[in-house]
């Protein structure tokens, strides 16, 4: 982008508006992050299981209604043609929502890449943000017998979040570019890292506030276990805190020689085709880089496992350990805080202090993470340990949070070393699709296992297997070779 061509009379306007745009971007993080951290990760899976149990029947006698404290219940679907475990109901819904989200995100990415207008992207953010917030709000108003509507609203909310996530990520480099002007690439990278980090911090801080308020709201409810009021609060938070985006985000005069694409409904098909073609181009580029392929295979495996550990552990704690909604929200807060600390201190301790290469740091984090499903498996052998008590879940919440935060920080840093300069957007979109794609498979497989055994503890075997299999994959990664290949491709 050329900044010399910007008219002189707008020179004072550009940095001021750039700062306003970045403030608007912070509000995007602040408003939407509680949905994914609180609602998707904790509240919605628990509510799905709860609705399944309320409308379910006993496993050993389908003529008897399921009682709240019954251990094994199944939910009759489609007039009793299909009976699924109440935990599987939540897992299948999550898997399906990520599938639709992935398809929608790939399709929308073409529109985002082609239509660079900030005003247009603002409208997309506000539209899908409003749809997602209202879907979340309506979940909080459902009757317990509306168990077909609940997964539909969960899918709509998750798909909406996926779209605004893509649009929000695409706006950050544009805003930073206007802010730094003609400064060198190093300055751009530093500013991007700082602003991105602040946005993530605001998002996590927002999620923490929502979680704390949720505990108070659930405590004040009649049965002290009303998750719907917490979900309704998340929807209200998302809806209200996105309002400043409408006033802060605004177009900035660009180089008049730069080709502009204005969105038209007539070209929607072409935009969607462009999104899928871009994914295909990313795959073709990735095939030229052996270590990128190795990394993405390994990432598919560990991302699948660690994402699924969260939903599995939450459902396990509710169905097997009988933990209350307040217990589980507290567990979620502990995990989130430890993830924030892990993201900061794990790279600092292992990479900077101990001078370990990022590849080894990642392998250490995987081994650390594998302790979680391994400990769950010991419950088949021992009577008093192996996730038999509530306090064990809190300890594993700390353990899991550290591993999750460390993995998020290290994985992106390691992958960035393997990416050719100038093609970052292409390869990180592939990274994102790999991440989302893995989240389809894990919950689906765990759901099938739980449906077959009606014991969600068996899921820990599969999760442990995933983590162990990823170790030789990442051991085969050659970072120096990957850097050389990336440099060669960047000159092509």
From Swiss-Prot:
Keywords, in A-Z order: Amino-acid transport, Autophagy, Glycoprotein, Membrane, Transmembrane, Transmembrane helix, Transport, Vacuole
Record's subcellular location: Vacuole membrane
Presence of the UniProt keyword Transmembrane helix in the record: yes
Pfam families (alphabetical): ATG22
Chain positions carrying an annotated carbohydrate: 158
Official protein name in the record: Autophagy-related protein 22
Gene encoding the protein: ATG22
GO cellular component terms, semicolon-separated: vacuolar membrane
Recorded GO MF terms: transmembrane transporter activity
Major localisation: membrane
TM spans (from-to): 27-47, 92-112, 124-144, 161-181, 199-219, 229-249, 292-312, 326-346, 362-382, 391-411, 430-450, 459-479
Entry annotated with the keyword Transferase: no
GO biological process entries: amino acid transmembrane export from vacuole; autophagy
Record function comment: Vacuolar effluxer which mediate the efflux of amino acids resulting from autophagic degradation. The release of autophagic amino acids allows the maintenance of protein synthesis and viability during nitrogen starvation.
Family note: Belongs to the ATG22 family.
Membrane disposition: Multi-pass membrane protein
Superkingdom assignment: Eukaryota
